[in-house]
Amino acid sequence: MAVTHSLGFPRIGAGRELKRAVEACWAGRTGPAELAQTGRELRERHWMIQSGSGIDLVPVGDFAWYDQMLNMTALLGAVPRRFGFQADALSLDQYFQLARGNAEQPAMEMTKWFDTNYHYIVPEFDRETGFGPGTEWLFDEVEEAKALRLNPKPVLIGPLTYLHLGKERQAGFSRLELLPRLLPAYAAILRRLHASGVPWVQMDEPILGMDLPPEWLEAFAPAYAALAEAGPKLLLATYFASVAEHAVWLKSSAVAGLHIDAVRAPEQVADFLKDFPADKVLSLGLIDGRNVWRTDLRRALEQAESAGAVLGERLWLAPSCSLLHVPQDLSLETSLNPEIKDWLAFAVQKLEELAVIDKGLRLGRQAVAAELAERDRLLQTRAQSPLIHDPGVKRRLEGLSDADFRRHSPFAERSPLQRERLRLPPFPTTTIGSFPQTPKIRAARAAHRRGELNGDAYRDAMRAAIREAVYKQESLGLDLLVHGEAERNDMVEYFGERLAGYAFTKHGWVQSYGSRCVKPPIIYGDVARPEPMTVEWIGYAQSLTKKPVKGMLTGPVTMLQWSFARDDQPRAVTALQIALAIRDEVADLEAAGVAAIQIDEPAFREGLPLKAADRADYLDWAVKAFRLASCGVADDTQIHTHMCYSEFGDILPAIAELDADVITIETCRSAMDLLEAFGAFGYPNDIGPGVYDIHSPRVPAGAEIRALLEKAAAAVDPERLWVNPDCGLKTRQWPEAEQALANMVEAARAMRRAESLAGSAA
């Protein structure tokens, strides 16, 4: 009989209880005790859901107040010394300061978790980094699960992944050198778990799906040989990509079990089944943990049956990865189109699907014949549904030519025309788009959605917010303004709601970072734009000022990456469909007199496949999608794009191929290190490195911002530098945003004065 288990479960709660509790604690409305109680209640609820669905081993340690990688840093006692915190006495408040910064120290860096829209807090390493006793949270949670008479399976980020995803804060050494110091800390954790009666521990090593240098690969076998002696049986878990090239040595390694992703890489199953050792278990991830479509149960059961014929009771069944990446429960969606709802499965439903596969494997197909027949019917209904197909969209794609994917003139010819039209000073200042979403703004949007605020009253409320944003920007002295995005609940959801082919949930929340949750739309069919989406708001903002106002759009790659995309056609085709819709909006904005249009692509890099061999194809269609969206404008219309949380060094040629006139990037948490790559590459167009971290409430001093600008000016031609925050200001409060922007504007003016003096001296 197969063992069923889960690699992780959504932690925020079906009603975003964790978000609300954390933010109440941050605001001082509640204390750590109340927050801790909410955490206990959520953990118990989620464990019981999983156990009630038939999961034999429930994950413990997948819960985190902010981030699971940050939890590992706290557990390992690897808290950066710059904060001055005692690792084994770390309070919740101090834990949050690591992620959010404080008056003395900026936050730890944050970046994307592989190719997902989840963000993790990056560990910091130097030669003196120590590992030792840390927080007790994991051990406490194990005891909580045992008290509920559950079978806990602790989940740890494995040591190689933990080190690899960290960052050196000191030149001249490799973080891999810390492995001999790190392994004893892991071994101590494993011994404690073993002493508490835990039989299995899941060790997540998703970096095995990447192209790793030889020294990193060679470190795995001896590392796990050492850890296997600590007591519990180790299940080494991989996901997001194939690890077939490592099958031979993984099967001979010291771990007691392996988990592989059979959704993203079903072909690798055969490599692992061949000569699979008799003393190990193999866990197959048969249910997609990354997307929301119902599983083809018949095909998944066939996979399980084939593996079971080889492995017998050594077969384990699981989702492909943690269910953190999907919403919690589809049953809460009472207003979703019933036909579309029938095609979907969220975390709870995915565990139910796993139970069907397990039952079919144990009792035979006849025991689940009704479930298989019903699923076959739903899959066929979806494939034939008229909701999916739009012949007009397909005709437009077929009619595209090379001219649709390029600007009229090269950047060197466009740039002077844009400068003349926009009349911007050196080191022009701007923001990334959104301004603080005040309770008043949110209340107006919510009332309008509920039908309690009519269209005229809603328009008046949004216009009032736009007026305030424009007034504040003019008062601060910003050069290129934005309208503030008061009307937008989310940069993807807002546009998706106005596009055909998208569906929306009421409760489909997933965690993005910390307390930040997003509700990704669902792309179920061909995408088209029925009518203009932003022209009214941008045009109104421009009517209030003589300064230029940027149009603000979300790019096609991000619209795809931050949605649950349809799985019945190539992602490249869906991206081009979205690009055509954005292209139409760009044309309408330009016709309305908008001189600068920003097409945000913060998710551009996150779509990059983990393996280099697969990347050229992705970059080809991703670049084409952006260019299709942006290249229909005149030379004197300035196209901006924004990217964040990214390591760009390996994709700079593709970023240059986007041919955006201005790119703004998030660089502050990495102290402008990213900009050096742009400088070394010789990035040809304008660039705006983020000069302060908007994810932290900390307000940087003007001198601090100027120091970053001076560092930027040493890496990139100052004539091509823009000055802007790291990202949008939606989650900040107005007082801190205004002070930070005032300091930013003053730093830009100081740079202009310095450049002017330098020019005079020359």
Swiss-Prot record:
Residues at which L-methionine binds: 432-434, 485, 600
Listed transmembrane segments: none
UniProt catalytic activity: 5-methyltetrahydropteroyltri-L-glutamate + L-homocysteine = tetrahydropteroyltri-L-glutamate + L-methionine
Cofactor or coenzyme needed: Zn(2+)
Amino acids binding Zn(2+): 642, 644, 666, 727
Alphabetical list of InterPro entries matching this protein: Cbl-indep_Met_Synth_N, Cobalamin-indep_Met_synthase, Met_Synth_C/arc, UROD/MetE-like_sf
Keywords for the protein's UniProt record, in alphabetical order: Amino-acid biosynthesis, Metal-binding, Methionine biosynthesis, Methyltransferase, Repeat, Transferase, Zinc
Family annotation (CDD domains): CIMS_C_terminal_like (cd03311), CIMS_N_terminal_like (cd03312)
An example Gene Ontology molecular-function term: zinc ion binding
Cofactor remark: Binds 1 zinc ion per subunit.
GO biological process per UniProt: methionine biosynthetic process; methylation
UniProt-annotated binding residues for 5-methyltetrahydropteroyltri-L-glutamate: 16-19, 112, 516-517, 562, 606
Record-annotated active site: 695
Gene3D superfamilies reported in the protein's UniProt record: 3.20.20.210
Pathway the protein takes part in: Amino-acid biosynthesis; L-methionine biosynthesis via de novo pathway; L-methionine from L-homocysteine (MetE route): step 1/1
EC number(s) per entry: 2.1.1.14
Protein family membership: Belongs to the vitamin-B12 independent methionine synthase family.
NCBIfam families attached to this UniProt entry: met_syn_B12ind, PRK05222.1
Stated role: Catalyzes the transfer of a methyl group from 5-methyltetrahydrofolate to homocysteine resulting in methionine formation.
Protein name (Swiss-Prot/TrEMBL): 5-methyltetrahydropteroyltriglutamate--homocysteine methyltransferase
Organism lineage: Bacteria, Pseudomonadati, Pseudomonadota, Gammaproteobacteria, Methylococcales
